[in-house]
């Protein structure tokens, strides 16, 4: 099993200009390889996949000998065609670390037992982390996939950048999301300071309310006032005299009254 994982059965052609895909160059290359030069290798071919959005072609065989044979031919072919920025690699296959699509019952049971053993070994190790750098997490770097080395052997990274393109005509570039700068200690201290400030502000507000309530004085208490309307001059003079004499008294005047003597139909 270990020998199979070390087999180099994948060929990568990278940095292919976009014009090559427009002119159907990958289709012509497939015809040259498997219909003209190596028709007997068609049965050993697992994948021939052009990826225009990544500017590359992936070719995967089921054995290393056929892979190296096609790889040497591609080296000579690209040198003759003056390929320019295109690069050629032979690497381990992406399919080596994946389980087959179908297994027998015995194989499934043995696979489950192996997975349980691995889980028991790593149960006590905290692997959840925002920063996946092995220097921080303490995980063995050999057990990590270095940013898709099978797809980009010359740009392997433990931080796993993302390949982005702003438009169909622009070149792809690697983008790495920055780590958050706020630490747990700083957030806890900020929450503590907020709690302290809120606790100290509440008593001061209560004291201000008590002071404002105790310092309020009533300057005038409203009382029901009344008006008197009378048609007689004697009663008006008497009421005015009485009001002048008893100005300091708190007796309210009588309620106003209107008398209707006659009704007109």
UniProtKB/Swiss-Prot annotation:
Residues 127-213, 242-265 are annotated as: Disordered. It is found in: Cytoplasm. This is Regulator of calcineurin 2. Its main location: cytoplasm. Keywords: Cytoplasm, Phosphoprotein. The modification Phosphoserine is found at residues 104, 110, 152, 157, 160, 183, 187, 193, 201, 255. GO terms for cellular component: cytoplasm. Phosphorylation of Ser-152 and Ser-160 is induced 2-fold in response to mating pheromone. Present with 967 molecules/cell in log phase SD medium. The modification Phosphothreonine is found at residue 132. Residues 141-161, 182-202 have a biased composition (Low complexity).
